[in-house]
């Protein structure tokens, strides 16, 4: 910053933390997941809503039950792979490639994994939705901590600029 250049290390310049192997999360249509595209899966929805979204919106091909399926060209498999262990993901790929395993079976497993994997987060979410004062209390505590940090920074800036009072 210009102040640091002119007056020394007044501000601590944050370092960016970027993940080199960050993945794009596909939406139900295979495109980038986005609320504006209406291709999202709300992980905090109830099981019935998640089931409806997966069964209706996750795109799969029309191959018959007995036909082998290509997991690598599947939005479904990409989503499944993101939320399950590598062991489960490999087993799903085997099932799809072998044939005799339909998209309906696969989607049922995805629904079960989504519901199970995010159960505790869903429970917390619903708790805080029903207890907004707890959220407000946490925000107030955070605001007090932030004010202390801001006051320290402002003091350091005033001192560096020669505005001690």
Question: Can you say where each PLM-predicted feature lies in the sequence?
Answer:
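Conserved nucleotide- and phosphate/pyrophosphate-binding catalytic cores
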Residues: 1-165
């Amino acid at each position: 910053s210009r102040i640091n250049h002119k007056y020394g290390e007044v501000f601590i310049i944050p370092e960016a933390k970027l993940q080199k192997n960050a993945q794009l999360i596909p939406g139900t249509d295979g495109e980038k997941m986005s609320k504006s595209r209406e291709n999202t899966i709300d992980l905090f929805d109830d099981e019935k809503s998640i089931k409806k979204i997966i069964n209706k919106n996750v795109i799969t091909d029309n191959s018959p039950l007995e036909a082998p399926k290509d997991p690598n060209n599947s939005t479904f498999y990409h989503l499944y792979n993101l939320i399950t262990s590598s062991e489960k993901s490999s087993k799903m790929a085997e099932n799809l490639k072998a044939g005799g395993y339909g998209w309906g079976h696969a989607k049922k497993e995805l629904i079960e994994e989504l519901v199970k994997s995010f159960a505790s987060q869903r429970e917390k979410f619903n708790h805080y939705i029903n207890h907004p004062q707890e959220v407000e209390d946490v925000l107030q505590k955070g605001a007090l901590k932030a004010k202390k940090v801001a006051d320290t920074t402002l003091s350091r800036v005033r001192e560096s600029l020669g505005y001690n009072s």
